[in-house]
Design a protein with these regions (language model features):
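Nucleotide-activated chemistry modules centered on ATP-dependent adenylation/adenylyltransferase
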Residues: 1-163
Length: 163
């Protein structure tokens, strides 16, 4: 009899960034659920290109894909007043918080105690900042934010090879 695996919801922004995290989490014994929620992606055609690539990746790895509704107005509301903020500033923090909060809400609604994000694999994203946001939200929802720095051990190189 196969042992039941813990589930983890992996917020995914694109197939390039999620390839290695999906593989890593599966190898660590998790049943991965890819949660594609990205109202910040523009134009809409780019959003659907990324979603289609994520579908292909999830099919390849045999993991479930949950496609959240594409609603850019949620993003614009979250970052209202921060339009002039530089990259890596407060606007980015609000966007990360929006996407991780939606991921946590999905996890909680489906009785899944673990969640994380593929965003941290980017060499342009701040692991400590994303971890702080994830852990804050996890505490609010009584969940576990898996603070895994997927960049370590050539993770970014590996994810590019997978994609």
């Amino acid at each position: 009899m196969e042992q039941k695996k813990d589930k983890i919801v992996l917020h995914t922004c694109c197939a390039i960034c999620s390839g290695y995290p999906v593989s890593f989490l599966q190898d660590a014994g998790y049943q991965v659920i890819s949660y594609f929620y990205n109202p910040n992606i523009y134009p809409e055609s780019e959003y659907y290109k990324r979603l289609e690539a994520e579908r292909t990746l999830c099919s390849y790895f045999g993991c479930e894909l949950v496609e959240a509704e594409y609603n850019p107005d949620e993003y614009y509301s979250a970052v209202a007043g921060l339009e002039d903020e530089p990259e890596k500033g407060k606007r980015c923090d609000k966007c990360f918080e929006l996407r991780l909060r939606k991921t946590a809400e999905f996890a909680k609604a489906n009785s899944i105690k673990n969640f994380t994000t593929s965003i941290v694999i980017s060499p342009h994203k701040n692991f400590a900042k994303l971890t702080a946001i994830g852990e804050k939200i996890a505490n609010e929802y009584s969940l576990n934010y898996a603070a895994i720095d997927f960049k370590k051990k050539d993770g970014f190189l590996k994810t590019n090879k997978i994609s």
